[in-house]
Structure formats: structure tokens, C-alpha cells
Amino acid sequence: QWPDPSSDIPP
């Protein structure tokens, strides 16, 4: 189960 890239938004 990979983390959603869309939810991995940099600051």
C-alpha cells in the first residue's frame, strides 16, 4: 500500500 503522491505535497 503506497502513499498517495497527491497527498505528498511539499510545503
From Swiss-Prot:
Has the keyword Secreted been applied to this entry? yes
What are the protein's UniProt keywords? Hypotensive agent, Metalloenzyme inhibitor, Metalloprotease inhibitor, Protease inhibitor, Pyrrolidone carboxylic acid, Secreted, Toxin
- Compartment(s) where it occurs, according to its Swiss-Prot or TrEMBL record: Secreted
Predominant subcellular localization, coarse grouping = secreted
Residues bearing the modification Pyrrolidone carboxylic acid: Q1
| Coiled coil, from the record | none
UniProt GO cellular component terms: extracellular region
An example of a Gene Ontology BP annotation on this entry?
regulation of blood pressure
Query: Which Gene Ontology molecular function entries are recorded, alphabetically?
Result: peptidase inhibitor activity; toxin activity
List the expressing tissues: Expressed by the venom gland.
At the top level of its lineage, which domain of life is listed? Eukaryota
The Swiss-Prot or TrEMBL record describes its family as follows: Belongs to the bradykinin-potentiating peptide family.
Q: What does this protein do?
A: This peptide both inhibits the activity of the angiotensin-converting enzyme (ACE) and enhances the action of bradykinin by inhibiting the peptidases that inactivate it. It acts as an indirect hypotensive agent.
Q: What is this protein called?
A: Bradykinin-potentiating peptide 11
Q: Which organism is it from?
A: Bothrops alternatus (Urutu)
